């Protein structure tokens, strides 16, 4: 089913579908231009961010202008072979990407730093 027929049939998309894709298992030496060549075939791209430090190398975020283009890319590029590596293309999900943190611990750390540097957030 093409992107145009998806739009015309007023197909409802699953809730996890969004314009931002998270791509894993990329070759470490892939360039932005190569990413645009691969992902641009499925629609207009707003932004591509490739991981460059030790922890994020081999990953990227691809942001499409249109949600249907993103769905089409996921459908066609999951498992796509690039330099003998099979891409893992997922929809970005904020809850899964962000680390859970202890709010009380964070507030305690902020309080300690405020005391250390003499900073107050209270109105005088």
From Swiss-Prot:
What Gene3D superfamilies does UniProt report for this protein, alphabetically?
3.30.70.330
Where in the numbering of this chain does the RRM domain appear?
19-94
* Keywords carried by this UniProt record: mRNA processing, mRNA splicing, Nucleus, RNA-binding
Q: Which SUPFAM superfamilies match?
A: RNA-binding domain, RBD (SSF54928)
Q: Name one GO molecular function term.
A: RNA binding
State whether keyword Kinase applies: no
Superkingdom: Eukaryota
The cross-references to InterPro entries, in alphabetical order and at most eight, read: Nucleotide-bd_a/b_plait_sf, RBD_domain_sf, RNA_proc/Spliceosome_comp, RRM_dom, SF3B6_RRM
List the SMART domains.
RRM
Q: Where in the cell is it found?
A: Nucleus
Q: Spell out the residue ranges making up region: Interaction with pre-mRNA branch site.
A: 16-29
Pfam families noted in UniProt: RRM_1 (PF00076)
**Which cellular component, as a GO term, is one annotated location?**
nucleus
| Example of a GO biological process term | RNA splicing
Purpose of the protein: May be necessary for the splicing of pre-mRNA.
Protein name as it appears in the record:
Splicing factor 3B subunit 6-like protein
Q: Which organism is it from?
A: Arabidopsis thaliana
């Amino acid at each position: 089913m093409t992107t145009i027929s998806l739009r015309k049939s007023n197909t409802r998309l699953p809730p996890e579908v969004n314009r931002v894709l998270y791509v894993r298992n990329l070759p470490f030496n892939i360039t932005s231009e190569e990413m645009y060549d691969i992902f641009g075939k499925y629609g207009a791209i707003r932004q591509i961010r490739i991981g460059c430090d030790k922890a994020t190398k081999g990953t990227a975020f691809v942001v499409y202008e249109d949600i249907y283009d993103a769905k089409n890319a996921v459908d066609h590029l999951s498992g796509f072979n690039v330099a003998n590596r099979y891409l893992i293309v997922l929809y970005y999900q904020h809850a899964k990407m962000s680390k859970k943190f202890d709010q009380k611990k964070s507030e305690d750390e902020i309080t300690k730093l405020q005391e250390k540097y003499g900073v107050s957030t209270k109105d005088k």
